[in-house]
A protein has these predicted regions:
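Active-site mouth loops of central-metabolism enzymes
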Residues: 26-45, 111-121, 157-163, 225-238, ...
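N-terminal beta1-alpha1-beta2 module of alpha/beta enzyme domains
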Residues: 2-103, 226-229
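Hydrophobic faces of well-ordered beta-strands that scaffold small-molecule active sites
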Residues: 10-16, 62-64, 107-113, 136-142, ...
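Catalytic cores of nucleotide-enabled group-transfer and carboxylate-activating enzymes in metabolic
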Residues: 69-70, 88-92, 99-112, 233, ...
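Active-site-proximal loop/turn and secondary-structure-junction residues that shape catalytic pockets
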Residues: 18, 68, 115-117, 144-148, ...
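Hydrophobic or amphipathic alpha-helical targeting/insertion segments
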Residues: 103, 111-154, 160, 168-172
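Conserved, mostly hydrophobic/aromatic
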Residues: 12, 54, 58, 100, ...
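An alpha-helical appendage that flanks or caps ligand/catalytic pockets
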Residues: 3-27, 35, 163-226, 259-338
Length: 338
């Protein structure tokens, strides 16, 4: 008997940094933009409407980014980011995800979580709580480096080198895995006759003692619906791709053109096999930026308006934040090497 070939499933998510909702510098100035005055994006009603719209469209998930801090690398100050609105205000992603999943009871949601910001005990509890309360509808985008400088400034720590952050993240997830699996699936008994709430023989201490983290455990919660929540990754570097191949079930990526997308796809899938996993174990979500209008010409006009609104200063603050580098010290016409 010949095995049937599995059909590929197309997945859609909406990716945004609420209440900041776009990826165009100065895009908030567009007449139809939410941050431009049509709606107050800090109020929950608009996001409930967005979530329910996504739910009705059968979109897989609301994918929520989180930069962790106001970008302050440009001129070593947050002033330019604040002035031009360069990805400045952001909700704490896990709490936002908790709200939208309550507003849209069948919608999936993915929260970005920075391993440099949280410790594994806090994150593991948060993830299990959300997994239980959403009945398994949440995932987490594990990142290590978006705006590392701004985040480190607010935590009072040194900025770790790129690969060192991934090394720490590996240990971070090791602790989480151990905590999430510290209860057997049948450990919660609730037997009134025997006065047995949970079977101690089926709940284990973790006793993790690593270079970066120490944790005794066990988890404070029994196993959640997914046991291990769906993990995503969004790293573009070779180290980030390796991390994704080892841990993720989904990857979010942005590529400049089709050949770059195909190259990224092949590389990550090959790394997946090298980790002993199947290529089908990980979905790759490639970002697109649709400009929507009542007609093609209307959409083109909107695109041209967005380009016209963008200022070099806003873009510079944005790039400086992403790279944690003060690009203001580099002349605008300087060609940057890799």
């Amino acid at each position: 008997m010949v095995a049937k070939k599995l059909k590929k499933q197309l997945h859609f998510t909406l990716f945004t940094f609420p209440p900041f909702v776009h990826h165009y510098p100065d895009g908030w100035r567009h007449p139809q933009e939410m941050l431009g005055g049509i709606y107050n994006p800090l109020e929950p009603e608009i996001w409930a409407r967005v979530a329910r719209t996504l739910e009705s469209m059968k979109v897989d998930a609301f994918f929520v980014g989180d930069g962790g801090a106001i970008y302050n690398s440009n001129e070593n100050s947050p002033s330019t980011s604040l002035h031009y609105g360069s990805q400045t205000i952001e909700f704490f992603a896990p709490q936002f995800v908790s709200m939208v999943t309550a507003m849209a009871p069948t919608l999936g949601a993915v929260s970005t979580v920075n391993t440099e910001e949280l410790n594994p005990w806090t994150f593991s509890r948060m993830a299990q709580t959300m997994d239980h309360l959403t009945k398994g509808r949440v995932g987490f985008n594990i990142v290590t480096g978006l705006n590392p400088g701004g985040l480190a400034d607010n935590l009072g720590v040194e900025v770790r080198e790129h690969d060192a952050r991934y090394e720490r993240a590996e240990e971070f997830l090791e602790v989480c895995y151990a905590l999430w699996q510290s209860w057997d699936s049948d450990a919660l008994v609730r037997d009134k006759e025997r006065s047995l709430f949970a079977d101690p023989k089926k709940v284990r201490e973790v006793n993790y003692n690593g270079r970066h983290f120490q944790c005794r455990g066990p988890s404070q919660l029994p196993r959640s619906p997914q046991e291990i929540p769906v993990l995503f990754q969004a790293g573009q570097s070779p180290r980030g791709r390796q991390f994704a191949a080892r841990h993720a079930e989904g990857v979010f990526t942005i590529s400049p053109d089709l050949p770059a997308m195909q190259s990224y796809y092949r590389d990550v899938k090959d790394r997946l096999v090298n980790e002993g996993r199947r290529k089908s174990d990980l979905a790759i979500l490639t970002g697109i930026f649709p400009i929507v209008g009542s007609s093609e010409s209307a959409a083109q006009e909107k695109y041209e308006q967005l380009v016209e609104l963008a200022t070099p200063e806003a873009g510079l603050a944005w790039c400086s934040g992403y790279a944690s580098y003060n690009f203001a010290q580099v002349p605008f016409d300087t060609k940057l090497s890799e």
